[in-house]
Amino acid sequence: MEITGEKLQEKINKGEKVIVELYATWCGPCKILKPIFERVANTNTTEVQMYTMDVDANKEIAASLGIRSVPTIKSFNMGKPVDTKVGLLQESQINDLVNNLVNG
């Protein structure tokens, strides 16, 4: 599910468990990662909320999150960043991020 920077910041500030894939439409690895990330998000039955966000459409929040390259996946819990992964990830690695956030 696509999210805006403003909505993402609201969810982080509320202390929700959030994982966001930050991507750009011109990025080749992002195009490969997006369906993998969405598959994990669609099968996710935990309290973790998963979103995608276009960094070019949300430059201010991307900058505030320290995004320097895409794709980047960031996870948050209790208003704080928990993990950051840069580059193309496998489905199992994304599942590990979800599990770490649930059990962490």
Give a label for each model feature.
Residues 1-17:
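A short beta-strand-turn-helix
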Residues 2-4, 22, 34-41, 45-60:
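Thiol-based oxidoreductase modules, predominantly thioredoxin-like and allied folds used
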Residues 9, 58-61, 92:
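Short loop/turn elements that flank and shape the SAM/SAH-binding pocket of Class I
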Residues 16, 23-26, 69:
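Short pre-active-site segment immediately N-terminal to redox-active cysteine/selenocysteine motifs
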Residues 21-23, 75:
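Structural cue for short, hydrophobic secondary-structure segments
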Residues 27-30, 73:
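The canonical Cys-X-X-Cys-His
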Residues 59, 65-74:
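Structural micro-motif
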Residues 75-104:
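Non-catalytic, surface beta->alpha helical segment in thiol-disulfide oxidoreductase systems
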